[in-house]
């Protein structure tokens, strides 16, 4: 039997390997709560999706079967293990439409909590169901696919929330001097985390990396000689992202100061960013830290680490006008994702286009 925290050579897993293992184990637990035939779909999905995507799809599909047991008289006395593929093709498009209606507000089975879904949530759950049905239809296990006869929920584009140039400076200045207004325990905590927080904020704003990529960084991933960090992207690919002098200064200040003075707990020795508990910082801790500071500087904007990524993408696009460069640096696999987010922002560019073409010399 294999020890899941160590490889055969007894070498500890890095953050990304460990997180894949944890998610795979979690997926197995979720699959136990789905109809047995669903395992085939998730096995087929494995080569082309991350464990996190499969977990999200498993939760979404579980909601669908709970809906059938709660709302469809045919399945009122069913338990999860009674469902068969033929039950999928016995449903009509109207059943799928009722499910979409149900998703807008429903009670979660485990704890009775009220769950609501907006456009994005509805689209994701419908996408999961279509993919699930599509697998059994493609393999001719079912002859009908009612999900294809139901329109996907319409997604409206939302304006990108980001920090303006002056707000970026205000945020960093605020973190640097926030201690001036603190005393006692709050001041001690601030002093302990100040350089780390400035390093994280400067890194997120200066490279546009994702928060999950940021917390996954190890000390060895930082290369000051070339001013680059090796990040593990969403799909597991590694890429070097380059940073400027401001980021280098903030990272160096943190690493040679607080980070070197820390004694990390066992298993966290390699982590670049440590919590006050001397463990690798988690995604939520970074999110809370960003919100804590941003709320003081831009109370009317809900700023998260992802908004810092949008801020970087916006600045880079405005400086270079090169959407392909922005897509590459942000690690977007499809340039259309980038276009959708950033091409709409540059109103000035479109205004210039209006006066660039002269019809008649005046």
Which role fits each region the language model picked out?
Residues 1-362:
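Conserved catalytic core of the tyrosine transesterase superfamily
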